[in-house]
């Protein structure tokens, strides 16, 4: 007996691709929820889902009517307060001259000076209200805080929105960098 014979085959190298599928989520570097800072009806949707936007670009317009009226009213209040300060300043100047000549008492002069201080305080308050009114008017143009892609837009023309809404107007995803999140099993 000798060595038993066996079949011999020469192997050739071949390229084999092994593929596996895994669920994954692709996200941008940062997702920013877009929420209104004032209440009102959406009068214009300026972008489409999936569109690229730039920082500062208007995404939505909220009806500005009431905010324009509030800004006009605040401007009028500032003008009224400025006039009151001017009038009170003239009164104080006149009373100072009369007081120097002993025509009116120190008390009368002090009352006029207090009225001037009060008018100046009302002017400062009116100016603060004007700044707030103009800021709210500006918030009727809902702008993108960054460059990115607009995600789903659940609100449409005519929707009533407010700062307390549960769902954001949309999400802008900064895609300057992309990240893939996958779940890999240990098998």
What are these regions (language model features)?
Residues 26-28:
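Structural recognition of beta-strand segments within beta-rich domains
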Residues 11, 18-21, 33-164, 177-181:
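Amphipathic alpha-helical coiled-coil/rod segments that serve as protein-protein coupling scaffolds
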Residues 1-23, 186-187:
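Acidic, gly/proline-rich low-complexity N-terminal segments at the extreme N terminus
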Residues 4-7, 147, 167, 175-178, ...:
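Beta-strand/loop subdomains of soluble extracytoplasmic proteins
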